[in-house]
Amino acid sequence: MLAACMGMTLLAGCDSEQQKTFNEAVKDLEQGSYEYALDEFTQSVNNGISLAVSYRGIGICQMRLGNYEDAISAFTSALSSDKVSKTMAKDLYLYRATARLQAGLLDDAMADCQTLAQKYEMDADCWFLSGKVALAMDGYDEASSDFEQAYGEDSCYDRAIQIYETYLEKDMEADGTRYLEAALSSEAKDTDDMCDRGRIYCYMEDYGNAKTELTNASSKGSTEAVLRLGMVYGAQ
């Protein structure tokens, strides 16, 4: 009986350590410590702890470290795991499509985007990614339609900048500039908005208005605005 109790205590201790490793992995991922998180999530997979979440964590770490093929493999393993909710599956398809895009596997990335469109409710992130993949495949009309859907659902400054930068990478700056102009039609609500407006004016090489926005933000205590002001002066 004593031996059995000791065995159960040791097993409980092992379970506790394994859960601690998993919790540390989640924490390290949130903090951007990708190499530590990768090692810990790998241990969690070996320990059979929250397999879908652990594989997802491995995939994100590998993607952030530039190891796109390994990231794709991890996201695929996560999708094949038991007890994957519909919400998590949608998230995993988004991540895998992104990794496939980064790896240059455009047909595979588009296949994931099509799965998202067929099986899940499309949101701004889905539409944006689908547009980005379409543009990489020179599907200009499809990309334009997807970006319009994305901005229609999330007309924030960051989204406008994302779309602009995607077009800029394809030397199609004019197509992206209209999103910057649309974003500027709204009023800034806080210092973050002022910083974003400053960034947009910089993209448009309107440094006078960029200074105005960033100066206003810095006067309200935004350290980001101070840094960006220095960049504006350096760009002139």
Model-found features: residue ranges?
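Register position in tetratricopeptide repeats
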Residues: E30-Q31, R64, Q102-A103, A136-M137, ...
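Canonical tetratricopeptide repeat
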Residues: G57, R64, M88-Y95, L129, ...
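Start-of-helix register in tetratricopeptide repeats
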Residues: Q19-K20, V53, I60, T87-D91, ...
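Short coil turns that delineate tetratricopeptide repeat
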Residues: I49, K83, T87, E121, ...
